[in-house]
């Protein structure tokens, strides 16, 4: 399964972000490193949750499909926010002075994700519960990243992660992904029904 590589990859992005922050590499990491850290951590938590539940309910088609379809939705913010920064009037970045527009573009992209979740829920109601789970994580990301965008509270943690060996962080992410796959698969196994005992005549 490729899921451990996804979580390991997200952990690698955290590693690059933290090491760039410690090295003072680039104004974006210096401005938003803490916010990116919490956003990525919540993304990992979201993926672990929806993938575990997708495996657990793999015998229930609607639930399984719903959780699997939330995975690209969680990824949607990253490319769409970059498109906003490239082309959207009022959010387009033309120079260093426009870098503070990065966070509003991320929040607008997440707001669009929530609009998609709302539209799916209005159409399918109880069958769309997996999207409500993903929506809860998206709301948590919006609040955490919006509040902590310029906060110094996460800086000590970011420095600590930046000073860790990269392999430790990436392999931890890989292990979390592997453990999630194993746990979800086992949770979805059919319960063994004991064979009836033949009665003596």
What name fits each language-model region?
Residues 1-201:
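Alpha-helical membrane insertion/targeting regions
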